[in-house]
From Swiss-Prot:
One Gene Ontology term of the molecular function aspect: rRNA binding
PANTHER family: 40S RIBOSOMAL PROTEIN S14/30S RIBOSOMAL PROTEIN S11
Entry keyword set: Ribonucleoprotein, Ribosomal protein, RNA-binding, rRNA-binding
GO biological process: translation
Function: Located on the platform of the 30S subunit, it bridges several disparate RNA helices of the 16S rRNA. Forms part of the Shine-Dalgarno cleft in the 70S ribosome.
Organism: Acidovorax ebreus (strain TPSY) (Diaphorobacter sp. (strain TPSY))
GO cellular component terms, semicolon-separated: ribonucleoprotein complex; ribosome
Protein name per its UniProtKB record: Small ribosomal subunit protein uS11
UniProt-listed Pfam families: Ribosomal_S11
């Protein structure tokens, strides 16, 4: 007799393994439309991530500093569960969620050891987008 599919699905679910990693890197990608926070270990393996859109903000509310703050809190709490205590923050992009995401991580009790801006700056590469006219 074949096993029921519900039973098989329940057996395949794996429990999250708690990694005891004390140091990590918070990658904050702040675009004009969204803010994505990924917290990794020193080797670059992702421990947790969150985005403004993933927290229920849609449309123009995704690109607010408050949405970035909420996303940082969600990613930070998940990283604390993994054992993170110290973070280096790497910020990429010109978006409005740059500063508020760093403040939110610090408010969670995570010690921020360094903040660096890794926004890619072209040496006159691709042509930029046309100016917006309203």
């Amino acid at each position: 007799m074949a096993k029921s599919p519900a039973n098989n699905a329940a057996q395949r679910v794996r429990k999250k393994v708690r990694k005891n990693i004390s140091d990590g890197i918070a990658h904050v990608h702040a675009s004009f439309n969204n803010t994505i926070i990924t917290i990794t270990d020193r080797q670059g393996n992702a421990l947790s991530w969150a985005s403004s859109g993933g927290q229920g903000f849609k449309g123009s509310r995704k690109s607010t500093p408050f949405a970035a703050q909420v996303a940082s809190e969600v990613a930070g709490r998940a990283a604390i569960e993994q054992g993170i205590k110290n973070l280096d923050v790497e910020i990429k992009g010109p978006g409005p969620g740059r500063e508020s995401s760093v403040r939110a991580l610090g408010a969670l009790g995570i010690r921020i050891t360094s903040i660096s801006d890794v926004t890619p700056v072209p040496h006159n590469g691709c042509r930029p987008q046309k100016r917006r006219r309203i």
